[in-house]
């Protein structure tokens, strides 16, 4: 049964979040041969990923997927893949076959199709989704409900957000296969959006929930 937990953190945000993620991943790995984890882009989770890279996980048993990607070259400093790779994938020496990302060298429709095929061939659900939320309440690159409600697992957007570029994103349908959803948010604007979500305001992040549990890690 889905439930929601909120942690309000004054200090030690990164260490607290990493410990919670480590504990959850270790428990999942005790129960399953392989686990499937969604990672958000953006700035907030990067220090968390950097600390996760120091953990002694059996990385060959963990498959990672990006929640969304900016439609820019993979070596661009705006690329979610590049930024996560620098702090996690390369540091932890995660096998390349366990890292699933959007091939932005393809036309955007083809990139979506390829990423969706890759997801479907790997799993029918995610075990853990580590997500963020924008100050406007967007999640992944779902800035409006029409995008989130697409029937596919993967879709694309017109130029949106900051930087204002086209994006590829998992949809609500994909994200809501996750057993556990962890939202990492910091700052007053995002806290205000969470307050609205708790009052059932239909912002995009409102519609993403873990099948077992949804956890919000809220920092200053």
UniProtKB/Swiss-Prot annotation:
Catalytic activity: 6-phospho-D-glucono-1,5-lactone + H2O = 6-phospho-D-gluconate + H(+)
InterPro entries associated with the record: 6-phosphogluconolactonase_DevB, Glc/Gal-6P_isomerase, NagB/RpiA_transferase-like, PGLS
Protein name: 6-phosphogluconolactonase
Lineage of origin: Bacteria, Thermotogati, Thermotogota, Thermotogae, Thermotogales
Keyword Hydrolase appears in the UniProt entry: yes
Highest taxon of source: Bacteria
GO molecular function, one term: 6-phosphogluconolactonase activity
SUPFAM superfamilies: NagB/RpiA/CoA transferase-like
Record organism: Thermotoga maritima (strain ATCC 43589 / DSM 3109 / JCM 10099 / NBRC 100826 / MSB8)
Reported function: Hydrolysis of 6-phosphogluconolactone to 6-phosphogluconate.
GO BP terms: carbohydrate metabolic process; pentose-phosphate shunt
Keywords assigned: Hydrolase
Pathway(s) the chain acts in: Carbohydrate degradation; pentose phosphate pathway; D-ribulose 5-phosphate from D-glucose 6-phosphate (oxidative stage): step 2/3
EC number: 3.1.1.31
Disulfide feature: none
């Amino acid at each position: 049964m889905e439930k929601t937990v909120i942690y309000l953190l004054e200090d030690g945000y990164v260490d607290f979040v990493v410990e919670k993620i480590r504990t959850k991943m270790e428990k999942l790995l005790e129960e399953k041969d392989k686990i499937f984890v969604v990672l958000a882009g953006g700035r907030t989770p990067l220090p968390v990923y950097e600390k996760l890279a120091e953990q002694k996980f059996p990385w060959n048993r963990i498959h990672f997927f990006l929640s969304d990607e900016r439609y820019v070259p993979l070596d661009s400093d705006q690329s979610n893949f590049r930024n996560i790779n620098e702090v996690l994938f390369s540091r932890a020496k995660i096998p390349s076959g366990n890292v699933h990302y959007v091939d932005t060298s393809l036309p955007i429709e083809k990139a979506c199709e390829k990423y969706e095929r890759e997801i479907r061939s790997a799993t029918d659900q995610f075990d853990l989704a580590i997500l963020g939320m924008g100050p406007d309440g967007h999640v992944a690159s779902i800035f409006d409900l029409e995008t989130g409600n697409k029937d596919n697992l993967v879709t694309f957007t017109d130029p949106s957000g900051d930087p204002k570029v086209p994006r590829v994103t998992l949809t609500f349908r994909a994200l809501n296969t996750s057993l556990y959803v962890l939202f990492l948010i910091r700052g007053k604007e995002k806290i205000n959006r969470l307050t609205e979500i708790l009052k059932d305001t239909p912002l995009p992040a409102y519609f993403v929930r873990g099948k077992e549990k949804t956890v919000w890690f809220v920092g200053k």
